[in-house]
Amino acid sequence: MIEKVLELGCGRKKRAGAIGVDILADSDADVVHDLDVFPYPFGNDEWDRILCFDVLEHVQHFVACVEEIWRIARPGATVEVSGPFMSSVNYFSDPTHRRAFTSRTFDYFIEGTPSFRYGYSRARFRLRACDFDRDQFPFRRGLHRFLLGWANRHKAQYEDRYAFLYPVYTVYFELEVIK
């Protein structure tokens, strides 16, 4: 069976084999749609993989967008998200960014985390992976490689104490849809 892949905010660099969605008509999008307009033009449980690379930081209604992603994803589907880390110069330099991310951004949707108890949403995910600067700088050497490795192994301590001393650029999530 062929995996159905949806790329939200594909811009002009849509991944091969994906159906692209973007707000801009002159993008590579197959579907032109504003991610802050609900519902999305897809059925329930339709997608096996949803890609959200550098797009969710631009939406106004983050929780509603995550709920829509959950609605249109099949049970067990993979959702990949990347966005600017809270101490990244890229977060602060782009006037269209509405939010930054930390390793705990999706905890509100993950059972067993302290933030889940607030009950913001019925959308549920399992965290498969969370990495700082994944694939961003594959040739980092020496001190940079050591510090990035340390930050990825000690996320809470890094975010609480050292994020502005040694800022990373992006945070990447791989989530599994739970229904």
Q: Where on the chain are the PLM-derived regions?
A:
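S-adenosyl-L-methionine-dependent methyltransferase catalytic module, highlighting the catalytic core
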Residues: 63-64, 68-70, 74, 78-179
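Conserved SAM-binding loop
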Residues: 2-88
